[in-house]
A protein has these predicted regions:
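Non-catalytic, C-terminal membrane-associated alpha-helical segments of glycosyltransferases
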Residues: 247-248, 252, 265-340
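Short, well-formed alpha-helical segments that are part of the catalytic scaffolds
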Residues: 17-32
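Short beta-strand-to-loop acidic/aromatic patch adjacent to the donor-nucleotide binding site
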Residues: 89-99
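Short, flexible, basic/aromatic active-site loop/helix in glycosyltransferases
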Residues: 141-177
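A short, conserved alpha-helix in the catalytic core of glycosyltransferases
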Residues: 178-179, 183-195, 200-227
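Glycine-rich, basic loop-to-helix element that forms the pyrophosphate-binding segment
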Residues: 67-87
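A conserved acidic beta->alpha catalytic loop
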Residues: 43-52, 69, 100-101
């Protein structure tokens, strides 16, 4: 069991999704101060009335940091964690998007459990209808785990190194390596060890890179199926292969190369021979925009291999422009194709 005085601060990153944010903050603040010390929201330059709504807090535990520009999810989480540590120095930080929230009672379960011996805890994240949320499934690095490597090599794909239904329905803890920032409980020791996410990533991959970094430094991360979260994430269909906002393809592929290098070590270069042809075949799913998609993915591969993170978001939006006006920037939506 956590010490009775263990402090927990939730951080939420939001951008133009006020309806989701209202539900998430309502759920969080339903927990008393003994369960939740504070909630810190980073408003990523929202233009939908979020700032006005947050300016009238109904709970003194709610604190708001407003960014004058959109930092993306990665920049938002870096800022949120830095501010949470500076303002509260909590025992635990709980991370989530504006559309992710603990199920009722989840924080009580966290405090009631023995959390010693682990630096971070990953929740079991489901859709509101109870289905496992695939994008939030914790993973085991197959390059560090022989059994996971062999399962993946034998055609298991993502199933070879991600937790599955049996892990979610059981009661046993599982040691994991890669975790999303929806329902991740980070201890003070974890932050002292691993520091903060790299905001230059902008969107995609910052969570997996951060948790892999924590593991590489000796931190321990446990998946606890009793810690239940919901992710009201419905903008993607399982069969989808096309980026609806083309600029996201740049960040997805650039950052994935950086994740692969961090996970694979010296095996990164042989693995690349299998990865790159698969990526280039995605061009066929972008009829009418193939030239733009190819331009973005070529730049992504170049920057990812060089581990360059200095491209501005304005540059990437310019690369993604076609003859039509570019769509809105919606970092929080995570709309896009399946991972990989």
């Amino acid at each position: 069991m956590n010490p009775p005085s263990a402090s927990l601060v939730a951080v939420v990153v939001t951008h133009n999704r006020l309806a989701h944010l209202r539900r998430t903050l309502g759920r969080l603040l339903d927990s008393g101060p003994d369960m939740l010390t504070a909630v810190l929201v980073v408003d990523n330059a929202s233009s939908d009335g979020t700032g006005d709504w947050l300016a009238e807090p109904e709970d003194p535990r709610l604190e708001v940091v407003t960014s004058p520009r959109n930092l993306g999810g990665a920049g938002g989480f870096e800022l949120a964690m830095r501010e949470a540590v500076a303002r509260f120095d909590p025992d635990w930080i709980l991370l989530m998007d504006d559309d992710g929230r603990p199920e009722p009672g989840a924080l009580a379960v966290f405090h009631a459990g023995d959390r010693s011996g682990w630096d971070a805890w990953a929740a079991a994240v489901r859709h509101p209808d109870g289905r496992i949320c695939d994008i939030n499934r914790p993973s085991i690095n197959p390059f560090w785990n022989r059994a996971a490597f062999l399962r993946t090599l034998r055609g298991g794909g993502r199933e070879g190194f991600h937790l599955g239904p049996a892990d979610y329905e059981g009661t046993a803890l599982r040691a994991v390596d890669g975790v999303s920032f929806v329902g991740l409980f980070l201890s003070r020791a974890a932050v002292l060890r691993a520091g903060y996410p790299d905001g230059r990533l902008f969107v995609y991959g910052d969570d997996v890179l951060y948790t892999l970094h924590l593991r590489r430094l000796g931190g321990r991360i446990a998946f606890d199926p009793a810690l239940r979260f919901e992710h009201d994430f419905s903008t993607i269909q399982a069969h989808e292969r096309r980026f609806r906002l083309l600029w996201k393809s740049y960040y997805h592929h650039r950052n994935l190369l950086i994740v692969y290098r961090a996970a694979a070590g010296w095996l990164f270069w042989p693995a690349l021979l299998a990865v790159l042809p698969k990526w280039l075949l995605k061009i066929r799913h972008h009829g009418g925009e193939r030239r733009v998609f190819l331009r973005l993915i070529t730049r992504a591969i170049r920057d990812g291999l060089a581990q360059r993170l200095d491209a501005t978001h304005e540059e990437i939006l310019a690369l993604a422009r076609t003859g039509s006006e570019p769509g809105p920037v919606e970092e929080g939506s995570k709309s896009g194709p399946e991972k990989g």
